[in-house]
Amino acid sequence: MKALLPWGMMLTALPSLAGAVFGPGVCYDVGKGSYSADARVKDTPDTVLCWAASSSNLIQYWQDTYLKPHAQPNTPNGMNAKVYGEPQGTRYLNVYEQFLKSSTGDSGGFQADALNWWFKNAPMKELGGKEAYYSIFDAQPAAAEARSYLMEEPTLVQFREMLEKAFRFKGQAAGLYVWQINRKERPGTMPSKSRFHAITCWGYETNASGEPSALYLSDSDDRTFGVFMVHVDRREIHDPFSGMSYPSIVFYTDDDVDGYQPGEYEPNLHSACAVLTPESVAKPRSKPNATPAEAAQKNTLLPAGAKLGSDLLVGNGENSVLLHAEKLKLDATLRISGGSLASVDALSARQVQNDGKLYLHGGANAPGNVQNKGYLECVGADSITLQGCDNSGRLALRGNKAANVKGGDFRNSGTLLLCGKAGISFDKAALDSTSGTILLGQDANGCTPTELRFTDAEGRTLSVTSAPNAVGELHNVRITPTSIEGNGSNAVLRHVKISGNPKLVNVQLEP
């Protein structure tokens, strides 16, 4: 392994082994032990902010992957300009500096809590209720999953499943929380004043049985600043403090295969958090906690759980608009008018219940997790994609080039109007989730699609082409590459030209 800088290592320089999984690029070790000189911690050679240090590693690694295209000047990111000793010339992550400034004292904590504070402004007593920098992100809630293994007597297979989840996507690593039986310390580390300790896992290896056999860790109490390998095993351990014995996942170094020798690194796993899925991709926004009246500004945030009972216009149709809303209940009319940038969402909305009218103009993607019982209109300047919507009302999807519907969480029991000048695509999962009416073709705005493509799991397609200046309607119809199946007299295709010579079953065609 080759050190890139005192604060980072290239994982690609590690040996390539069968069964090895590494996070790509640079990993971080903020070396928080050097903060022992901080005036607030005068009587100890160590602080207990290892949870903040490990969380900083994870956050910076994720920001390197997803934040760069959207970085703002006030984003805590990269290295701090300060230079510290121990070792000489050390510099630290700005993310960790923010944790240090916000901390109310030398208090222990958990990585999962720190990550949720950073990305969601969730309360964390160790940070005294101070506001996080979360307001610069428009992100899904950080997927910081804390799971305690200490009392579960986990198997190696269960531990492997956690690791697989932690390293499934780019930009992910794992924060591990360990229980230091017999106060095992790796040489070169700051002596810990707590039996609990937070470390960062950057990769793992499995044996022929698929069980974890090694981990690649960084310990931010480590004065040597490096990624080191530990072996993994499941052993019966004895806790001298409680007098209890129980099986646990144990990490050990090469010199400690046969026993517990003082001065060697051998904690056992207490809990783990696999964090920050790629759905958490960051987009900048201006300020948190805007009231509905303030939401007409560019890049705004509605408070979580907001209820909008009066009409509201957001945007002027020229600038790009990003409205962030969680658990929004809409009983009135909300119009969001953005610019022509198809790469900017007009609305990033999660868990929105629309019983009124919601207009989204200027986005490339319709919002996910919307329950629409009223009228929802999504217009894309280029193409537009809809997924994750439960529509029992009337939903209009218009793309200046194409309109695409993806299945999965999509359900339609109401009316869906699709308009895409260059075509409309519907995957099979979306079609199978449709029991209502699909309208295609021109509407009051003169939007006329050239074709409607239905794609099955194998990628085969059947095109349904609308006649010129006509509106096609599909009522309770299921289309496959070889047949069109309907529900008796309720299955009607109107003003539609069908290509592909499919077999018609219980379907009525009207001119």
Task: Give the residues covered by each predicted segment.
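Extended low-polarity, hydrophobic cluster-rich segments
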Residues: N57, R195, L269-V275, L417-C419, ...
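Extracellular beta-strand-rich, repetitive "passenger/adhesive" scaffolds
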Residues: P292-K307, L313-L328, T333-P511
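Active-site-adjacent structural segments surrounding the nucleophilic cysteine of cysteine proteases
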Residues: A18-L127, D254-D256, Y260, S280-S286
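N-terminal signal peptide c-region/cleavage motif recognized by signal peptidases
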Residues: A13-P15
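Intrinsic-disorder/low-complexity loop/linker signature
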Residues: K32-G33, R183-P191, G210, V227, ...
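Positively charged n-region of N-terminal signal peptides that target proteins for export
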Residues: M1-P6
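Predominantly the structural core of cysteine protease catalytic domains
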Residues: L100-T206, P212, Y265-H270, P284-S286
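Active-site signature of cysteine proteases
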Residues: R160-M162, Y177-E294
